[in-house]
Amino acid sequence: MKKLFLAFGILISSLAYSQQEIKLDIADALIIRSIEFSYENYLTEDSSFGISALFNLAKQDITFRYNENTMITPYYRHYFSTNEQWNFFGEGFIGINSGKTEVTNLGGSGVSYKKYTDGALGVAVGTKYVASGGLIIDLYAGVGRNLFGTDSPILVPRLGLNVGWRF
């Protein structure tokens, strides 16, 4: 019976601590015409892990766009301050990305596109604001390096202005 009460108490206390977030990157949606969703789960008060999914909606021939058409990014964040509303973090991520790279045809007779899929390892830094009602705003910037393909871009950007909800 004691074990049952202990298990029930741990379950209730874990639900009382808001430790999950869902977010949408509004900067990507408004500026670059792409959608990025994120989910983040807190391990402790100063560390979390999450996953982001980026889908590029811009056409391939537009000059100002991400190179990647899709990118799935698992990440780990460590928070450096103990302030509950404003917090600074460092992030390590692995970005699995795919897209098309521009290839000039032999003889200069036009341009074609070659598909690629690659994995990037990178770091980012950022800050996060958490309102008492659960609203989340975070801003981050970082860069990763593609490791495997020769047809993929060398560097992968990780930029974002996320708005979301903690529950």
Regions from the language model: what does each represent?
Residues L4, S18-I22, E45-F49, E84-G90, ...:
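Outer-envelope beta-barrel architecture signal
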Residues K23-E36, Q60-N67, E84, L147-V156:
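Solvent-exposed loop/turn segments connecting transmembrane beta-strands
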Residues I32-S34, N69-T73, D118-G122, V156-R158:
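Transmembrane beta-barrel architecture of outer-membrane proteins
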